[in-house]
Protein backbone atom coordinates (compact mmCIF):
# COMPACT_ATOMS: atom_id res chain seq x y z
CA UNK A 1 0.00 0.00 0.00
CA UNK A 2 1.36 3.42 -0.96
CA UNK A 3 1.43 6.38 1.41
CA UNK A 4 -0.66 9.32 0.29
CA UNK A 5 0.92 11.57 -2.30
CA UNK A 6 2.22 14.28 -2.05
CA UNK A 7 2.79 13.76 1.67
CA UNK A 8 6.58 13.52 1.49
CA UNK A 9 8.62 16.56 0.59
CA UNK A 10 12.38 16.25 0.31
CA UNK A 11 15.19 18.77 -0.13
CA UNK A 12 13.84 22.21 -0.80
CA UNK A 13 10.22 21.12 -0.30
CA UNK A 14 7.63 22.48 2.06
CA UNK A 15 6.37 20.52 5.08
CA UNK A 16 3.31 18.43 4.29
CA UNK A 17 0.70 17.57 6.90
CA UNK A 18 -1.87 15.09 5.72
CA UNK A 19 -4.15 12.47 7.25
CA UNK A 20 -3.90 8.91 6.01
CA UNK A 21 -7.26 7.29 5.13
CA UNK A 22 -8.68 4.68 7.44
CA UNK A 23 -7.06 1.25 6.98
CA UNK A 24 -7.95 -2.13 8.40
CA UNK A 25 -5.20 -3.18 10.78
CA UNK A 26 -4.60 -5.89 13.33
CA UNK A 27 -2.07 -5.00 16.02
CA UNK A 28 -0.43 -8.03 17.61
CA UNK A 29 1.66 -8.16 20.78
CA UNK A 30 3.69 -11.26 21.60
CA UNK A 31 3.84 -11.75 25.36
CA UNK A 32 7.41 -11.94 26.60
CA UNK A 33 8.96 -12.86 29.93
CA UNK A 34 8.54 -9.34 31.35
CA UNK A 35 4.75 -9.45 30.93
CA UNK A 36 4.23 -13.07 32.01
CA UNK A 37 1.26 -13.38 34.41
CA UNK A 38 0.04 -9.85 33.72
CA UNK A 39 -3.65 -9.27 33.15
CA UNK A 40 -4.80 -7.93 29.79
CA UNK A 41 -5.81 -4.59 31.28
CA UNK A 42 -2.47 -4.30 33.12
CA UNK A 43 -0.58 -4.78 29.87
CA UNK A 44 -2.71 -2.27 27.97
CA UNK A 45 -2.54 0.48 30.58
CA UNK A 46 1.19 -0.01 31.15
CA UNK A 47 2.50 -0.47 27.63
CA UNK A 48 -0.04 1.43 25.51
CA UNK A 49 -0.68 4.70 27.29
CA UNK A 50 -2.39 6.52 24.43
CA UNK A 51 -5.70 5.37 26.00
CA UNK A 52 -6.63 5.36 29.68
CA UNK A 53 -7.99 2.31 31.51
CA UNK A 54 -11.60 3.24 30.81
CA UNK A 55 -10.88 3.54 27.10
CA UNK A 56 -9.24 0.12 26.94
CA UNK A 57 -12.09 -1.49 28.91
CA UNK A 58 -14.55 -0.09 26.37
CA UNK A 59 -12.51 -1.64 23.55
CA UNK A 60 -12.37 -4.97 25.33
CA UNK A 61 -16.13 -4.89 25.95
CA UNK A 62 -16.63 -4.21 22.23
CA UNK A 63 -14.84 -7.48 21.43
CA UNK A 64 -11.85 -5.86 19.75
CA UNK A 65 -9.24 -8.06 21.50
CA UNK A 66 -8.36 -11.74 21.20
CA UNK A 67 -5.79 -13.97 22.88
CA UNK A 68 -4.49 -16.59 20.47
CA UNK A 69 -7.71 -16.17 18.51
CA UNK A 70 -10.08 -16.37 21.50
CA UNK A 71 -12.08 -13.41 22.88
CA UNK A 72 -10.21 -11.51 25.60
CA UNK A 73 -11.53 -9.90 28.77
CA UNK A 74 -9.78 -7.34 31.02
CA UNK A 75 -8.80 -9.74 33.79
CA UNK A 76 -7.59 -12.60 31.59
CA UNK A 77 -4.03 -13.61 32.51
CA UNK A 78 -1.37 -13.49 29.81
CA UNK A 79 1.38 -16.09 29.70
CA UNK A 80 4.72 -15.91 27.95
CA UNK A 81 4.37 -16.95 24.31
CA UNK A 82 0.72 -15.93 23.96
CA UNK A 83 -0.33 -13.36 21.35
CA UNK A 84 -2.73 -10.54 22.21
CA UNK A 85 -4.38 -9.11 19.09
CA UNK A 86 -6.19 -5.80 18.78
CA UNK A 87 -8.77 -5.47 16.00
CA UNK A 88 -9.65 -1.74 16.13
CA UNK A 89 -12.94 -0.83 14.52
CA UNK A 90 -12.21 2.86 13.99
CA UNK A 91 -8.46 3.38 14.06
CA UNK A 92 -7.59 6.74 12.53
CA UNK A 93 -4.00 7.84 12.82
CA UNK A 94 -3.46 11.36 14.16
CA UNK A 95 -2.11 13.97 11.79
CA UNK A 96 1.65 14.51 11.90
CA UNK A 97 4.20 16.54 9.97
CA UNK A 98 5.35 14.09 7.30
CA UNK A 99 8.23 16.27 6.15
CA UNK A 100 11.77 14.91 6.03
CA UNK A 101 14.84 15.60 3.94
CA UNK A 102 17.54 13.23 2.71
CA UNK A 103 20.93 14.71 3.61
CA UNK A 104 22.98 11.82 2.21
CA UNK A 105 22.21 8.64 0.31
CA UNK A 106 24.17 5.66 -1.01
CA UNK A 107 23.65 1.90 -1.27
CA UNK A 108 24.54 1.35 2.40
CA UNK A 109 22.76 4.10 4.29
CA UNK A 110 20.59 7.20 4.40
CA UNK A 111 21.07 10.25 6.58
CA UNK A 112 17.69 11.82 7.31
CA UNK A 113 16.72 15.18 8.79
CA UNK A 114 13.17 14.78 10.13
CA UNK A 115 10.50 17.15 11.35
CA UNK A 116 9.59 17.67 15.00
CA UNK A 117 6.28 15.82 14.77
CA UNK A 118 6.99 12.53 13.00
CA UNK A 119 7.23 9.11 14.69
CA UNK A 120 10.16 7.02 13.50
CA UNK A 121 8.81 3.52 14.18
CA UNK A 122 5.30 2.04 14.13
CA UNK A 123 3.91 2.02 17.67
CA UNK A 124 0.49 2.40 19.22
CA UNK A 125 -1.87 4.08 16.75
CA UNK A 126 0.95 4.97 14.35
CA UNK A 127 1.87 2.88 11.33
CA UNK A 128 1.40 4.77 8.05
CA UNK A 129 2.27 8.05 9.76
CA UNK A 130 5.86 7.01 10.49
CA UNK A 131 9.23 7.73 8.93
CA UNK A 132 9.79 3.97 8.69
CA UNK A 133 6.71 3.54 6.48
CA UNK A 134 7.53 6.51 4.26
CA UNK A 135 11.11 5.36 3.69
CA UNK A 136 10.19 1.68 3.24
CA UNK A 137 7.75 2.62 0.49
CA UNK A 138 10.51 4.46 -1.37
CA UNK A 139 13.63 2.42 -0.58
CA UNK A 140 12.37 -1.04 0.37
CA UNK A 141 13.68 -2.76 3.49
CA UNK A 142 15.36 -0.32 5.86
CA UNK A 143 16.97 -0.52 9.29
CA UNK A 144 16.82 2.63 11.47
CA UNK A 145 20.05 2.73 13.48
CA UNK A 146 19.57 5.61 15.91
CA UNK A 147 16.08 6.49 17.05
CA UNK A 148 14.51 9.82 17.80
CA UNK A 149 11.30 10.50 19.69
CA UNK A 150 8.30 11.64 17.67
CA UNK A 151 8.76 15.24 18.82
CA UNK A 152 12.56 15.36 18.46
CA UNK A 153 13.65 16.92 15.18
CA UNK A 154 16.90 16.51 13.30
CA UNK A 155 19.37 13.90 12.16
CA UNK A 156 19.20 10.13 12.22
CA UNK A 157 20.78 7.33 10.18
CA UNK A 158 18.97 4.53 8.38
CA UNK A 159 20.88 1.49 7.12
CA UNK A 160 19.82 -0.11 3.85
CA UNK A 161 21.33 -3.56 4.49
CA UNK A 162 21.56 -5.79 7.58
CA UNK A 163 25.37 -5.75 7.34
CA UNK A 164 25.48 -1.95 7.33
CA UNK A 165 23.06 -1.86 10.26
CA UNK A 166 25.22 -4.23 12.31
CA UNK A 167 28.42 -2.28 11.62
CA UNK A 168 26.82 1.07 12.39
CA UNK A 169 25.30 -0.25 15.61
CA UNK A 170 28.71 -1.51 16.75
CA UNK A 171 30.49 1.76 15.93
CA UNK A 172 31.12 4.61 18.35
CA UNK A 173 29.19 7.75 17.42
CA UNK A 174 29.42 11.40 18.31
CA UNK A 175 25.98 12.92 18.86
CA UNK A 176 25.16 16.50 19.75
CA UNK A 177 21.73 17.94 20.44
CA UNK A 178 20.31 21.37 21.12
CA UNK A 179 17.72 21.68 23.90
CA UNK A 180 15.74 24.78 24.80
CA UNK A 181 15.04 24.74 28.54
CA UNK A 182 13.25 26.82 31.13
CA UNK A 183 15.61 28.80 33.36
CA UNK A 184 19.19 30.04 33.04
CA UNK A 185 21.69 27.26 32.42
CA UNK A 186 25.05 29.00 32.89
CA UNK A 187 27.77 26.42 33.59
CA UNK A 188 29.22 23.40 31.79
CA UNK A 189 28.15 20.20 33.54
CA UNK A 190 29.41 16.66 33.04
CA UNK A 191 26.23 14.83 34.08
CA UNK A 192 27.34 11.29 34.86
CA UNK A 193 25.08 9.07 36.90
CA UNK A 194 22.07 6.84 36.37
CA UNK A 195 18.48 6.85 35.15
CA UNK A 196 15.72 5.23 37.21
CA UNK A 197 11.94 5.29 37.16
CA UNK A 198 10.45 8.46 38.60
CA UNK A 199 8.13 6.94 41.19
CA UNK A 200 6.76 10.38 42.12
CA UNK A 201 5.19 10.76 38.68
CA UNK A 202 1.79 9.31 37.73
CA UNK A 203 3.32 8.40 34.35
CA UNK A 204 4.98 5.01 34.65
CA UNK A 205 7.42 5.53 31.79
CA UNK A 206 8.86 8.74 33.24
CA UNK A 207 12.46 8.55 34.42
CA UNK A 208 14.69 10.66 36.62
CA UNK A 209 18.42 11.27 36.63
CA UNK A 210 20.51 10.69 39.76
CA UNK A 211 23.88 12.45 39.64
CA UNK A 212 26.57 9.96 40.59
CA UNK A 213 23.96 7.24 40.98
CA UNK A 214 24.78 3.57 40.43
CA UNK A 215 21.31 1.99 40.40
CA UNK A 216 19.36 1.77 37.15
CA UNK A 217 20.93 2.53 33.77
CA UNK A 218 24.26 4.32 33.74
CA UNK A 219 24.36 7.48 31.63
CA UNK A 220 26.62 10.39 30.81
CA UNK A 221 25.76 13.69 29.11
CA UNK A 222 28.01 16.72 28.71
CA UNK A 223 25.80 19.82 28.99
CA UNK A 224 27.06 23.19 27.75
CA UNK A 225 25.31 26.59 27.78
CA UNK A 226 24.96 27.84 24.21
CA UNK A 227 22.85 31.00 24.55
CA UNK A 228 20.87 32.69 27.33
CA UNK A 229 17.54 34.43 26.83
CA UNK A 230 15.20 36.27 29.19
CA UNK A 231 13.55 33.15 30.64
CA UNK A 232 15.03 30.29 28.61
CA UNK A 233 18.44 28.83 27.77
CA UNK A 234 19.70 27.02 24.71
CA UNK A 235 21.82 24.08 25.86
CA UNK A 236 24.14 21.89 23.80
CA UNK A 237 24.10 18.25 24.92
CA UNK A 238 26.80 15.78 23.91
CA UNK A 239 25.90 12.14 24.49
CA UNK A 240 28.35 9.52 25.73
CA UNK A 241 25.60 6.94 26.28
CA UNK A 242 22.31 6.48 24.46
CA UNK A 243 19.59 5.80 27.02
CA UNK A 244 15.87 6.33 26.55
CA UNK A 245 14.89 9.94 27.40
CA UNK A 246 18.47 10.58 28.56
CA UNK A 247 18.72 14.29 27.73
CA UNK A 248 15.13 15.09 28.68
CA UNK A 249 15.24 13.26 32.03
CA UNK A 250 18.69 14.61 32.92
CA UNK A 251 17.82 18.26 32.29
CA UNK A 252 14.45 17.88 34.05
CA UNK A 253 16.06 16.35 37.13
CA UNK A 254 18.67 19.12 37.23
CA UNK A 255 15.89 21.74 37.33
CA UNK A 256 15.87 22.74 33.65
CA UNK A 257 12.77 21.18 32.04
CA UNK A 258 12.53 21.26 28.25
CA UNK A 259 10.26 23.82 26.68
CA UNK A 260 7.24 22.08 25.12
CA UNK A 261 7.88 18.71 26.75
CA UNK A 262 4.63 17.11 27.94
CA UNK A 263 6.42 14.49 30.06
CA UNK A 264 9.63 16.23 31.20
CA UNK A 265 8.37 19.81 31.06
CA UNK A 266 6.64 22.04 33.56
CA UNK A 267 3.60 19.77 34.13
CA UNK A 268 3.53 16.04 33.34
CA UNK A 269 -0.26 15.89 33.81
CA UNK A 270 -0.40 17.39 30.31
CA UNK A 271 1.10 14.13 29.04
CA UNK A 272 -1.79 12.23 30.62
CA UNK A 273 -4.33 14.74 29.33
CA UNK A 274 -3.14 14.39 25.74
CA UNK A 275 -3.11 10.60 26.05
CA UNK A 276 -6.73 10.62 27.27
CA UNK A 277 -8.19 13.36 25.09
CA UNK A 278 -5.95 13.16 22.04
CA UNK A 279 -5.06 16.85 22.05
CA UNK A 280 -4.27 19.87 24.21
CA UNK A 281 -5.76 23.36 24.33
CA UNK A 282 -4.07 26.57 23.28
CA UNK A 283 -3.81 27.46 26.98
CA UNK A 284 -1.95 24.20 27.57
CA UNK A 285 0.49 24.96 24.77
CA UNK A 286 0.95 28.46 26.13
CA UNK A 287 1.98 26.90 29.43
CA UNK A 288 4.38 24.52 27.68
CA UNK A 289 5.92 27.25 25.54
CA UNK A 290 5.85 25.20 22.32
CA UNK A 291 3.64 22.61 20.66
CA UNK A 292 6.40 19.99 20.72
CA UNK A 293 9.46 19.32 22.84
CA UNK A 294 12.35 21.67 22.02
CA UNK A 295 14.99 19.01 21.32
CA UNK A 296 16.96 18.83 18.07
CA UNK A 297 19.52 16.30 16.85
CA UNK A 298 22.08 18.75 15.43
CA UNK A 299 25.34 16.86 14.78
CA UNK A 300 26.11 13.23 13.93
CA UNK A 301 29.60 11.81 13.38
CA UNK A 302 30.20 8.15 12.50
CA UNK A 303 32.28 5.92 10.23
CA UNK A 304 30.86 4.71 6.95
CA UNK A 305 30.13 0.96 7.35
CA UNK A 306 31.79 0.04 4.04
CA UNK A 307 34.60 2.56 3.50
CA UNK A 308 35.48 3.36 7.11
CA UNK A 309 35.50 7.06 6.25
CA UNK A 310 34.48 9.39 9.06
CA UNK A 311 31.35 11.33 8.16
CA UNK A 312 29.89 14.35 9.95
CA UNK A 313 26.48 15.91 9.34
CA UNK A 314 24.99 19.12 10.72
CA UNK A 315 21.37 20.25 10.97
CA UNK A 316 20.53 23.88 11.80
CA UNK A 317 18.20 24.77 14.63
CA UNK A 318 14.64 24.61 13.22
CA UNK A 319 12.47 27.67 12.99
CA UNK A 320 9.92 26.59 15.63
CA UNK A 321 12.63 26.34 18.30
CA UNK A 322 14.12 29.66 17.19
CA UNK A 323 10.72 31.31 17.61
CA UNK A 324 10.41 29.90 21.14
CA UNK A 325 13.76 31.36 22.26
CA UNK A 326 12.90 34.17 24.64
What are these regions (language model features)?
Residues 1-326:
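RNA pseudouridine synthases
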